[in-house]
From Swiss-Prot:
Keywords: ATP-binding, Cytoplasm, DNA damage, DNA repair, DNA replication, DNA-binding, Nucleotide-binding, SOS response. The RecF protein is involved in DNA metabolism; it is required for DNA replication and normal SOS inducibility. RecF binds preferentially to single-stranded, linear DNA. It also seems to bind ATP. This is DNA replication and repair protein RecF. It holds the Pfam family SMC_N. ATP binds at residues 30-37. GO terms for molecular function: ATP binding; single-stranded DNA binding. It comes from the Bacteria. The gene is recF. One of its GO terms (biological process) is DNA replication. The keyword ATP-binding applies. Belongs to the RecF family. The keyword Flavoprotein does not apply.
Length: 364
């Protein structure tokens, strides 16, 4: 997957700018606040439907403007297939959005996000390891969404049933109606959990190997799924029935895949609460790169890799290891920094851009 053109309109500091990145590594430098991160933010918004720095309506649209617009043109380069040029556009006001993909309107944002895959490492990525369960569930589901075509319909089926059951619990609905939605939750939730389990097992092998190469001092040894109920003791249908009275009192569903989580086990660190911020960042990066490698194996092409403010997130040794690993493969990479990272100073085969005064200038 190679981005050929990125155009931004009314996004944060930018009025209208355009970037024509190259295959391989693209380095964007500039002072703090110049807008480097906003470029990666635009890619992330197209790939995930949200920014990694908050909601669209919280400052992403340029002040005084009604909506932002993003246009991306890229080549799909799957194995044994010739490159295929694709185009996507998004207009977002913070409340409403309109998207187009390959010349056609899209009815659901998920359809737009399914087209462009971006794996992003940014200053908040440590939350993947040290934060709450929601980002970890999203991490699993994003990967499955891209490598298993029917996963989205399964996830939507579960989400709809959960919404209906929660509404009934709040309204004090009759047991016969709860029986119906318990059955639907179990029918979708059991296979959804099996997918998550198998995916995490696959990622575990890659994450352990990557961490041993990039940050051997971490001693990552395993990744373990907590499915959201005592799955080793009883099926989800029984867990929902047993929790029904408690759920009636609480007004929401307390067991199921929406309560799932996963953790990383270390040789010499007792758990995530004992991790330093630096250790959490390195662990998160290993997980993200493992996800990118798995995507590449399953789909036959690499996702775009975006590394925001790499020099301030990792020390020089770890920067060098990460960049050496990535530069040895075919991925298109975007790196932002206030100045050229030491690991890149001697390289000549990278594309360089400077961001200043809300403009992007290619550096010869």
């Amino acid at each position: 997957m190679q981005i050929r053109r990125l155009a931004l309109h009314q996004l944060r500091r930018f009025n209208a700018v355009e970037l024509s990145p190259q295959p391989g590594l693209n380095l964007l430098t500039g002072d703090n606040g110049a807008g480097k991160t906003s470029i990666l933010e635009a890619l992330h918004l197209m790939a995930y439907g949200r920014s990694f720095r908050g909601r669209v309506r919280d400052g992403l649209v340029r002040q005084g403007q009604e909506a932002l617009e993003i246009f991306v043109e890229w080549d799909e380069q799957r194995a044994s297939h010739p490159p295929h040029r694709r185009k996507a556009g998004l207009r977002h006001s913070g409340q409403d959005w309109k998207g187009r993909l390959d010349g056609e309107d899209v009815a659901q944002l998920g359809n737009l996000c399914a087209a462009l895959a971006v794996v992003t490492f940014e200053p908040g990525s440590h939350a993947l390891v040290s934060g709450g369960g929601e980002p970890r569930r999203r991490f699993l589901d994003w990967g499955l969404f891209h490598v298993e075509p029917d996963f989205l319909s399964l996830w939507r089926r579960y989400s709809r049933a959960l919404k209906q059951r929660n509404a009934l619990l709040k309204q004090g609905g009759p047991s016969r109606m709860l029986d119906t939605w318990d059955h639907e939750l179990a029918e979708a939730g059991e296979p959804l959990t099996s997918r998550r389990q198998h995916y995490l097992e696959r990622l575990q092998q890659r994450t352990v190997a990557l961490a041993a190469e990039l940050a051997p001092q971490l001693g990552i040894q395993a990744m373990e799924l907590s499915p959201g109920w005592r799955r080793h003791e009883l099926p989800l249908a029984d867990a929902l029935l047993l929790a029904r009275e408690r759920d009636r009192q609480a007004g929401y569903t307390s067991v199921g895949p929406h309560r799932a989580d996963w953790s990383v086990d270390f040789h010499n660190i007792p758990g995530r609460d004992a991790l330093s911020r630096g250790q959490a960042k390195l662990t998160a990066l290993a997980c993200l790169l493992a996800q990118a490698e798995d995507y590449a194996e399953q789909r036959g092409e690499w996702p775009v890799i975006a590394l925001d403010d790499l020099a301030s997130e990792l020390d020089r040794t770890h920067q060098a290891r990460v960049l050496e690993r990535l530069l040895g493969g075919p991925a298109q990479i975007f790196v932002t920094a206030t100045e050229t990272p030491a690991a890149l100073q001697e390289l000549t085969h990278i594309a360089r851009f400077h961001v200043e005064h809300a403009q992007i200038v290619a550096v010869p």
